Amino acid sequence: MAINQAHVHPHYTLPGVMHYLQTEFTKNERDRITWELERSEMKARIAELEGENRDLKHQLNQIQSKAVSPEGEKEEKHVPDSLLQSKLAVQENVKEIIYLLKGPNTVNQLESLNSREAGSELHDLEKLNVNTPKEEGSAKTNGMDILNNALLDTKPNPKQGPSESPSPTKVKSLFSTANKRENNETISKIHSELSKVDIISSYGDCMALYDADTKSLEIHQVDANLNSKLLKKISLGQDSDIMKFFWVSTSKLLVIEKSFHLKLFSISSASLISDVDLLQDSEQPFSSSDIINIDFKNKWLLIASKNKSQIRIWELDNIEAPEDVPINIKETYEITHDNDDDDSNDSTNILDCILGITEKSLILLSSNPYQLTIYDFEGKLLQKIDLKIDTILSGKPEEEGYHLFLDRKTSKLLIQLSNERLLVYSFDKKKVVLKEQLTPSSTLPIQLDLNDSIITVSYSNGDFEFRNLENLKPSIDEFVVADINFSERKEPVVFSSNLIVDSTPVLITVNKNNEVLLHKIKI
C-alpha cells in the first residue's frame, strides 16, 4: 500500500526575501567595486610606466644629441629641463587618475554601501575589506598607495632653474603690513632695466618681466633670500604685440601675439625657435578685441572668443621636446557654444573658458543663466552645472571680473563673478561647496590669482589680501604696497603670485618707480 508522503513547501517571508536580495546585491556591488579598484590600479601603474618611459626617452635623446654635437658640455644643461618635463607630465597623469578614483564609479558607490552621510569624506576603503593583501602572501598594492608614491617621486623641485649662482640685490621694506610685521627678510626690491613692466609671469623660481613699449623681455631667477639674478634679456622685435605668454619649461617661452602668431623662444640663446600662424587654415579668423581668455597646458593651446561664442584648441607638436626644435600644429578643434536647450530668446554670453581637469576637456562659464558647461574637444556636451545665482550682480556680463581658476591638486574650481562674489565648485562632491561675498566698494577693479590653494586678491588701490581655497577666509597676511598710489588709476595692478621660492609662494608686483617688489606669502 502506497503511503502518501506530505510535500514540504519552503516558507518565504517578506523580511527574509528582502534580506536575501540585499545580501546578494551587496555581494555583487563589492565584486564590482573590487573590479573598478583593480582597473584604477592598472591605470595608475600604466601612468607610472608611461612616465618612466617618457623619462627614458628624454635621457636617450640627450645622449644621442650629445654624441653628435661638437659642444657636448653645453648640451648637459638641458638634461635637468628634460627630466623636469617628464616629471611634470607624470604628475599631471597621476592627478588625473586621482580624480578618476574619486569619481562616481568607485568612491560614490562605497559611500552608498556604507550608508554614509553626503558631506563626509570619501576616502575610507577599509570597511569593505577589498583591495587588501591576501593571507597567502599576495603582493597586491593599493591603488592610492601607488598614486601617493608617484606624487612623492615626481614632485618638481622649485629651486631647479637655469642657474645656481644668483647675485645679491638691494633689499629694504616696501610693504606696510596690516599686522605690522617687522621681518624684512620676506620683502625685497629688484631693479629692472625695463622702462616699465606690463606683464609678469613666473615658473618655479624664475620670473619674466615684459615691457610693451620696448618689446623687451627680462628673465630673472630668485633665491631663498629673495635675491635676484638677471639671466637673460630678449628682444621680441618691434612688430611684436603680445597678448599673453606661457612658460613651456625653464628654457622656453611660448608667446601669443595679437596677430595670432605663435612664437617659441629659447631663453638660453635668447633667440626665436619657431613662428606659426594659428589662423593660416581658418575660414573664420578671430579678432583680438573679441578674445575672452587664452589658456595653455602641456601641448594644448585654447583661445575663447565672444564672436559667435567660439572656442578653438590647437594640439602643438614638438612642444615638449627638450631640444630647441620648431613646433607645428598637429590638430585643430573648433567648438561653438550655444544655448539651444533654453526656451527663451535671450542669448548666452561666454564669460571665461579654460582647459578642463581631464585630458581633452574644457570648462566654460556663461551667463543667462550663470552656469558651467563642460565639453570635450569634439564639441560633445559632457555636463552642465547651474550655479543657482539668485541675486542680481553689480557687474554686467560683458564687463571684466568673471574668471575661472582650476586647482587640479584638490579638484576644485574657483569662480569669480562680477568682481564681488567667489564660488568654489568641487568636482569630487559635484556641487558648489563655498560661497563668499567680497566688498570692493571704491577699490574696483579686483583681480585674483590662484597658486597651490592660495588665493591672492589684488585691489586697484594697492591693497593685497590672501585667502585659502579650503574656506575662502582671509589670512592675517594682509598688506598695502608702499611707495605706490593707485587711487587715481583704473587699470588693473600688474602682479603674479606663481613664483615659488624655497617651497614658498611669492607675490610679485611693481610700484610707481618701476621697482619690482617681492613678498613671501605667509598663510
From Swiss-Prot:
The keyword Cytoplasm applies. GO terms for biological process: cellular response to pheromone; re-entry into mitotic cell cycle after pheromone arrest; regulation of cell cycle; regulation of signal transduction. InterPro entries: Striatin_N (IPR013258), WD40_repeat_dom_sf (IPR036322), WD_repeat_striatin (IPR051488). The modification Phosphothreonine is found at residue 132. It comes from the Eukaryota. Residues 61-80, 150-171 are annotated as: Disordered. It is found in: Cytoplasm; Endoplasmic reticulum. Keywords: Cell cycle, Coiled coil, Cytoplasm, Endoplasmic reticulum, Phosphoprotein. Residues 26-76 form a coiled coil. Residues 160-171 have a biased composition (Polar residues). The keyword Cytoplasm applies. Residues 71-80 have a biased composition (Basic and acidic residues). The modification Phosphoserine is found at residue 115. One of its GO terms (cellular component) is endoplasmic reticulum membrane. Participates in the control of the reentry into the cell cycle following pheromone treatment. Component of a complex at least composed of FAR3, FAR7, FAR8, FAR10, FAR11 and VPS64. Present with 4010 molecules/cell in log phase SD medium. This is Factor arrest protein 8. It comes from Saccharomyces cerevisiae (strain ATCC 204508 / S288c) (Baker's yeast). The gene is FAR8.
